[in-house]
């Protein structure tokens, strides 16, 4: 959105901001603020703000342009992560349709970040969520099937998953589970 709002002596423009509660918080905080230094300190503390521009005008109201970070996935249902691996809080009211959801411990987030930037998808199967649990390891949920990759992620598993997806698409096969946890090969499970 691009929402011009006026506070004290400033017009505030929110550009590509997707979270209305974040907008409200900024408006409430800056409503009566005139001090540029205090405004900068406040805006610098907000991790969801990628950058901002403050333009001083002498004959009309000054303006603040606030640009939001664009999340590439939701982490553990309470945080967003952007393309620069900046983690910022997700408010309860945030609505972000069709964004990847990842649930894993912080210590494993680095492992999955590379894959998220270069996902393996086909036109018929896009990635919906990635979960890690101590029993099965990494589980990738696609629109039409689930891929179990095990506890250790490496290029071999991603290549194997990519080739398996290409094969399944070419042969018009629709398994419910693609299991890549074994070094012996790929196991497919079809629902009856």
Task: Give the ranges of each region predicted by the language model.
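Charged, solvent-exposed interaction patches on well-folded alpha/beta domains
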Residues: 1-192
